Amino acid sequence: MSLISDLLISGRKQLVWMAAISLSVVACNETGKIDRRAVVERHRIVTDSVYHRSPAQVGNGNFAFGVDVTGLQTFVPFNTMSHWSWHSFPLPDGVKVEDYTGVPMDTYGKMIPYEVGDPNKPEITAWLVANPHRFNLGRIGLQMTHADGSPVVESDLMNPHQEVDLWKGIIYSSFQIDGEKVEVTTACDPDQDALGVYIKSPLVAQGRIGVFFDFPYADHGDFRDTVGDYNAYDKHRSEVISNGSQSAEILRTMDSTTYYTALKWATPASFGQDTPSDSPHRFLLMPTEGEELMFTCAFSPDAIAVDQLPSASQIDEASAKAWEAYWMSGAAIDLSESTDPRWEELERRIVLSQYVLRVNEAGDLPPQESGLVNNGWFGRFHYEMIWWHGVHYGLWNRWELFDRSLHIFPDFLPTSIQRAQKMGRRGAKWPKCTADFDREWPCWAHGLLIWQQPHPIYFAEMDYRLHPTQETLDKWKDVVLNSAQYMADYAHYDAANDRYVLGPPVVIVSENTDALKTVNPIFELGYWRYGLRTAQQWRERLGMPREPQWDTVLNKLSPLPIQDSVYVTYEGIPDMWTKYTFEHPALTGVFGMLPGDGVDTTVYRRTLDKVNREWQSDRIWGWDFPMMAMGAARSGNPELAIDMLMHNSKQFRFDEHGLASGGPWPYFPSNGGLLTAVAMMAGGWDGSQGEAPGFPKNGKWVVKYENFVPMQ
């Protein structure tokens, strides 16, 4: 039997359900209101060591500042990142962006241009790979000396202690130098890219502590913990354009990129070039009296009204207010009455993931895999990963934090339509990896990947379930219809077997098969069914007739591939269980992450069991564990769901700051996936029954939860 026949809701039930959700999007058990502050406070981050890879962070979703144990970037050059900080190196002489036109590939007798690397045009291909890239706005740290004037080094730190107050979004740091205590408070303004810093120490009065500001040039590096080149002195400019008794402003120029840094201090201090330094891009704020230094530092692509900047204390107050509002909004979960010994670590991961995702991934653009910690893939975001970074916000009833970045779909719709037209197809083909404008990074996987294509239909459906209005329909109409039209045109009619197939060429979720031979990948088939089915529902809601072509493709789309009574990665795959049990086990995602269009639940359960036994858990990615957890929950195995969320693989670990493994470090899809799975397991899904249906009913789990939104 087909699962989806059990999940389709009649028109009357759909209206009743939507009426209920419009009044109160709540999934709440009988135990009542949760003490949210107690849940958050018991996972307060407390560290007493120097971490060289893992920063503590403050941020607002668009901007983040990573710090070492001193509360600034004193000994470890962590990064200051934003969603607007993009840079491109100059093009090679004689090379134009228009030189790249794609690479034609035979697709069922048609030569279709795909956005893959062009070996005949290596210069422009290489330039497009690396540009644009995100850059580090600058480094801020303490410049400290001993009584004899020699510089303080990391090994001189004594009794370091740092606490991240998650409830307020403020970092409190302290340590000793030569027996004297130094205290640093660090906070981020919730509404602008500005930091508030407060420093207190007898060393301030002794003239032995200042704050340095060091600006790097953009670098060619990728997958590096430190972003920027601090030695390329002659390739950029740092110009002090104002310098008063209590403020200063710096204009930064890197090739065609400009931005501003502004400082405002509330305690006596002077600002200028750090003269002992060889770098013209290093400056020093030096207190001139008292034991305190309090300042604000702001970054912007536009000139800053320095006199209107908030003080450090005002930023502290605003941060505390905004973070309390965040924690009190949306859903919450409390596992503290459970007796399973894993409850505390699971709850810690849940709380810290909510913090680091709000800091790094609640901005005006979809996030890159490493958020605003460092650069991976040159800082660009991946369209197929938007689901894993953001769906949790909708399920945790914080839709607005996801919605603020989804404008990329209508914004990039015209260029995506052009991309499809160049390929001889209708509709819109979404890119795979891009920055703040729609230009694909030419790469084999990027040009041939397709599982990002139905995403906007899924997001639109989430939005409509939360906001079933004409306004929502109008908002998503063109995106949904053009996404589906491309999907229908992409499917190839196999006349010999009277069916539609996907690929070749196609790069699938796991990216580990031969794209020129792969046909009918299971996850993509399931998602195509979901996307076309849902798009037809949208046509009906819009008062439009069903599109006959879409129904034809739906009705004749190839079934999910089966070998030896279990699902397999793609149709006809050879040696599936001896050669391909690594990378993403996407065959488990068709019923869990997705609602199960075309799935036989008996076959699925056998498949999930086999994957659990035979897949190489140290050769997959962080979001694969939540994907399997959702599959386990939806198929009636909540014990396995918990096992997946607490798996001991090196690919799914969460450090002291909540930063996760699972890919190039840190890997935020691990955090987003965890929150998505937990929301589903607590709040349920279409067709689920009972309270917290994804948690075990073995007497070891007591799950208090409220305000979750059921998953599709």
Model-derived features: positions:
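C-terminal motif of bacterial Sec signal peptides marking the signal peptidase cleavage site
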Residues: 25-27
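Catalytic cores of secreted or luminal carbohydrate-active enzymes
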Residues: 129-153, 537, 672-708
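Acidic/His metal-coordination segments adjacent to aromatic residues that form catalytic metal sites
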Residues: 366-380, 430-448, 503-521, 651-663
